[in-house]
């Protein structure tokens, strides 16, 4: 459903749930050509896409014009984003956006345990919005923070936190990026960043010394980010200028490693308070040996691909991406915060519809999964409203 609504363009995907995408794959740029050349030389299977960028007209959105710099926005709106897809549709169907508002807590009825609405601050005034149902989408730091800050007589340790699950099992993906220099110009910015991907290393392989796996895709750090990459290698002054003037000769790959969920990686409330007088989030995080082994293996594969494609110098920067978890989906309230429909175990008319509900990280960009999970929750919420169970 979401792939049709965005829409998604790409090759037929052979991994996971093999299927075709609504739009055909985009032409491959220099970075993608290098990735495909290296993977072919090593016998690694790779595919173009998937990306949520129109390859052909879609409604009032035109075909991608391949101007590059996709991470800074899309001049012609070929690239999907909520601002040009679901938000306009929601507004057209009666939704109201109250910008510059800060929700301070969820109001809970002491007797029934149901959510009554939310308290929020806007234009310096405290306000209250009554609601038959409440959906929280503050993401993996702010959603647990709001639940914890909503402690009340019914939930003295925070909403939905009777079993100390709120804020736990936060995850990031290991996301090292490895770049290689080529004699010919590459111009890696001239294509969608995740242009070509492989998930050949995604699943657990008993031959490896770690569980789960990683994916690899082309990435296209723009000049400012490229300068940060180079500076992280210790280059400065004249050496940094030389790397920057050579920018168009570099190709860059990125891995997404499925770091494991750990209960000690969590959000709690700090003593420090924000401008609204609310405790800010405190984030505790550490890696396990399995995480470190994954990232090391991913870096090795990326180096092999670039060398097989003909790279000379190769450099790597260690980085992380895609925070998820903190209000995870589970079979019961002893091990999570919401059920399979993103509905709170503790508060029957409270939903959480963001990446904090993911129980594991996966080794791919999580945006489409988050959107699909939220869409399923919306269907469930709407069905409840129609049947009268929302009241």
Where do the PLM segments sit?
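FAD cofactor-binding and catalytic pocket of flavoenzymes
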Residues: 33, 163-282, 335, 345, ...
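Glycine-rich loop(s) and the adjacent beta-strand/alpha-helix scaffold that form part
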Residues: 76, 92, 101, 105-111, ...
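Generic, well-ordered alpha-helical scaffold segments in large soluble proteins
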Residues: 1-5, 38, 42, 89, ...
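A glycine-rich dinucleotide-binding beta-alpha-beta segment and adjacent secondary-structure elements
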Residues: 49, 58-70, 77, 104-109, ...
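Conserved redox-cofactor binding core of oxidoreductases
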Residues: 1-103, 323-328
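A conserved FAD-binding loop/helix module that cradles the flavin
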Residues: 360-381
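Hydrophobic (often cysteine-bearing) scaffold residues that line and stabilize catalytic clefts
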Residues: 28-31, 79, 83, 294-298, ...
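Surface-exposed helix-capping loop/turn segments at secondary-structure junctions
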Residues: 4-15, 42-45, 109, 187, ...
């Amino acid at each position: 459903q979401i792939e049709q609504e965005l829409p998604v363009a790409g090759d037929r995907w052979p991994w996971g749930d093999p299927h075709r995408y609504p739009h055909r794959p985009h032409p491959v740029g220099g970075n993608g050509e290098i990735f495909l050349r290296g993977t072919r030389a090593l016998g690694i299977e790779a595919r173009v896409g998937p990306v949520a960028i129109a390859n052909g007209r879609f409604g009032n959105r035109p075909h991608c014009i391949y101007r590059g710099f996709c991470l800074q926005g899309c001049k012609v709106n070929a690239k999907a984003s909520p601002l040009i897809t679901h938000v306009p549709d929601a507004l057209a169907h009666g939704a109201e956006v109250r910008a510059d508002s800060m929700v301070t807590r969820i109001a809970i009825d002491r007797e029934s345990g149901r959510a009554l609405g939310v308290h929020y601050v806007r234009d310096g005034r405290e306000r209250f919005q009554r609601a038959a149902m409440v959906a929280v989408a503050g993401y993996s730091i702010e959603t647990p923070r709001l639940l914890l800050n909503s402690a009340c007589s019914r939930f003295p340790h925070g909403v939905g936190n009777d079993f100390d699950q709120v804020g736990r099992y936060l995850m990031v993906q290991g996301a090292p990026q490895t770049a290689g220099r080529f004699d010919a110009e590459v111009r890696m910015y001239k294509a969608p960043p995740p242009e070509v991907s492989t998930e050949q290393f995604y699943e657990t392989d008993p031959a490896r010394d770690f569980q789960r796996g990683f994916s690899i895709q082309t990435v296209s750090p723009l000049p400012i980010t490229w300068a940060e990459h180079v500076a992280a290698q210790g280059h400065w002054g004249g050496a940094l200028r030389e790397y920057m003037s050579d920018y168009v000769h570099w190709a860059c790959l990125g891995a997404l490693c499925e770091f494991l969920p750990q209960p000690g990686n969590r959000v709690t409330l700090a003593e420090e308070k924000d401008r609204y007088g609310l405790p800010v989030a405190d984030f505790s995080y550490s890696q396990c040996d399995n995480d470190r082994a994954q990232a090391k293996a991913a870096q090795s594969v990326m180096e092999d691909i670039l060398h097989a494609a003909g790279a000379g110098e190769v450099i790597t920067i260690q980085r992380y991406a895609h925070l998820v978890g903190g209000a995870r989906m589970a079979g019961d309230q002893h091990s999570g915060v919401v059920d399979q429909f993103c509905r709170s175990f503790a508060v029957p008319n409270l939903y959480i519809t963001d990446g904090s509900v993911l129980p594991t990280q996966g080794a791919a960009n999580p945006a489409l999964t988050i959107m699909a999970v939220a869409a399923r929750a919306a269907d469930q919420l709407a069905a409840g409203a129609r049947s009268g169970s929302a009241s």
